[in-house]
Amino acid sequence: MIPFPTERLDAILARHDIVTAQLASGEIDPETVVQLSRELSDLDPVVAAIRAYRAALENLAGVEALIDEPGTDPEMRALAAEEKPEALAALETAHRALQLLLLPKDAADEKSAILEVRAGTGGDEAALFAGDLFRMYAKYAESKGWRVEVISESEGTVGGFREVVAEVKGRGVFARLKFESGAHRVQRVPDTETQGRIHTSAATVAVLPEAEEVDIHVNDADLKIDTMRAQGAGGQHVNKTESAIRITHLPTGIVVFVQEERSQHKNRARAMALLRARLYEAERNAKDSARAADRKAQVGSGDRSERIRTYNFPQGRVTDHRINLTLYKLEEVMAGTALDEVVDALITEHQAELLAAEGMA
């Protein structure tokens, strides 16, 4: 158990006192009140954990003093020896809780997310699998009380999706879904297979934190906006008004296209939200690139070409290759009810990587 630097803990406690005093003074403007209130809500659980950790340290030190002190009554020494394992366990629990709270925070974790699922290799079967994955996430979102709104979709010829993009709205969505980015592989016998042969196909998933205007500034002069009639399967026009929107961000070449709504205004708003999310992701990736070069994380690398998970239907098996996790709960995972088991394991591994990087493991 690596002890925490006293100076770091004292600095957090001192900052908590300063923020509390500033808020109590009544001498700050409303905008600063909002900022400090948000900071205080972040500091409160850390301060509580520091106090619990120090209390556990003090308790263990008292127990050990009774055991080691030559003049201690034998009966008291025996009682202290019995209490020591419990005191040590309490300290380990408090230490672990504080460890996790001191980890670097991903500013995007509390945000909603943009979910993109695209069929990969495998033709019609890949499109069907992309549809299965999207339904898995939709059911998972429903179980969490999140709201899913489709931004754009392109259906496969026999079902499923060649591509589907959706907003998943709710608090903490990105924290739970961000490790889903990557290549997902399926092994199963397609309905059209007469010989009973297992086929392998794939779909890619990208999860982007939803960006607000305060997160990323988009200059109107950098945009090329085209309007056109919405199109259905096969390219035929499905309405007579030019409600579909395509926005090109000229400096980066990023293009977004939205046609789901009948209203051009709504499609434009959704297209701008999608563009901001992609620009925000690019900015985050640029900031993270130097750190990624120093330490290649197995979890959370976000590489869309990386094969992260296999869904084997004949065996009823789901395997996440980043952490060597295998669950024989394929139906439950695809129904969204057991996806938490995979997500929780990925988060735990990511926390372990962060602890090691911070020298706290």
UniProtKB/Swiss-Prot annotation:
Pfam families: PCRF (PF03462), RF-1 (PF00472). The modification N5-methylglutamine is found at Q236. Keywords: Cytoplasm, Methylation, Protein biosynthesis. One of its GO terms (cellular component) is cytoplasm. One of its GO terms (molecular function) is translation release factor activity, codon specific. The keyword Ion transport does not apply. SMART domains: PCRF. It comes from the Bacteria. Disulfide bonds: none annotated. It is found in: Cytoplasm. Signal peptide: none annotated. Methylated by PrmC. Methylation increases the termination efficiency of RF1. Peptide chain release factor 1 directs the termination of translation in response to the peptide chain termination codons UAG and UAA. This is Peptide chain release factor 1. It comes from Methylobacterium radiotolerans (strain ATCC 27329 / DSM 1819 / JCM 2831 / NBRC 15690 / NCIMB 10815 / 0-1). The lineage of its organism: Bacteria, Pseudomonadati, Pseudomonadota, Alphaproteobacteria, Hyphomicrobiales.
